[in-house]
Amino acid sequence: MSTEERPPLGKFGKRSLEKYVFPYLDSSNATMTTPRFGSDYNAVALDDEKVLVVSTDPLAISPQLGWERSGRLALQVITTDVAVSGIAPNYLVANWNLPPTTSDETFEKIWRGFTEEARCSEVQIAGGHTGRYEGSSFPTIGAGTAFGVGKKEDLVPQTPSPGDEIFLLNHLGLEASAIFSFYFPERLSDGTSPSIVAEVKQLFDDLRPTSDLCYLSSLPGVRALHDIAEGGLLGGVQETLASEQGQCGARIVRDSVKVDDRVARICSFLDLDPLKITSIGSGIALVSPDRVNEFIRLVEDKDLPVEEIGEVTASNEISIENEDGTETLTGPIRDEFWARLSEFKGNP
């Protein structure tokens, strides 16, 4: 297979999932949700009242981030996908396929960060597997699965409807900016300033997205909730609306999407659009218009950085209102972060 024919890296897109994955699945009566593109989790009925929510993600560990910090981030990536369901993550299992040269002491540092973050998120590690294997290499060295058990009535409906207001739990662009700051501190300090790089690193270390998303999922009027990862905000909006099979669209007002000044400086230096890059710690909430005031009051009581950025529409298009006109999304969002990171690694 030539380089030109190589499949894209990252998550399977909608077409690949629907053609090569979903046709082979057999959903039982106990499965409350059908696997679909854009879904953060799936739910299984345990009885008439209780539900089990599950989600699996890769375990990604980056030496440049620091072993303990990478462990903390890996835990957050896994648990946030359950947190958006309305059921808090309770348990987790992890499969670590370590590179052959990974020492016990190195893994202990990763594990320390992972387990400390689990305690902060009130998640118990129920089991797993740990070993060294030929062919394994950083960053992707396994996978983790989070479980949450709760009442069916607490599940977020995940049913967007025209007129719903779109709110952003706003740490937009922070993950990508922080990763560059840890990987290339000197180059970013030269392009911005040493204080900006240091402050963005600290902002990233202070993130606690699992508890924030659990809180948002419990609020009245929340009709859908989605964490923002690959594809950024705009990719997240696409995934959030995917359940409606083209029956809903969205209008996003770019000027309403506030980006931290320090993050914006780094994104500008890197020529990255904060709306199109991975942003662990951020989330999208769709709120019924008749509950918006109550939602805002409760968010303000918690002092969360949440902003209204648009609304769900009856069209099947996602439009972004910019200063110089309106842009309509015509296809999947290509996360610009990964390409830029590869460029920087290739041009030290």
Regions found by a protein language model. Give the residues of each.
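Helix-biased detector of long, well-ordered alpha-helical tracts
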Residues: 1-348
